[in-house]
């Protein structure tokens, strides 16, 4: 399963950590240079209203959630 997360803050990091042994892949979209979730997973630097990257998450992920 592939999960997209809008926002790469501490909640996103805790979500990623809770699925570490569950064979779940994450894609995180966050506008900051080094969000907390980037310690564990690849983060895409983009604004939350960037249509191109929102479309990418919608197409690539089985589910998308929000971290804020």
Language model: regions and residue ranges:
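ATP-binding N-terminal substructure of ATP-dependent carboxylate-amine bond-forming enzymes
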Residues: 1-68
């Amino acid at each position: 399963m592939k999960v997209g997360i809008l926002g790469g803050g501490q909640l996103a990091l805790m979500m990623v950590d809770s699925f570490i042994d569950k064979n779940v892949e994450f894609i995180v979209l966050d506008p900051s240079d080094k969000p907390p979730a980037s310690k564990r997973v690849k983060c895409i630097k983009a604004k939350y209203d960037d249509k191109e990257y929102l479309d990418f998450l919608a197409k690539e992920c089985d589910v998308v959630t929000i971290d804020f």
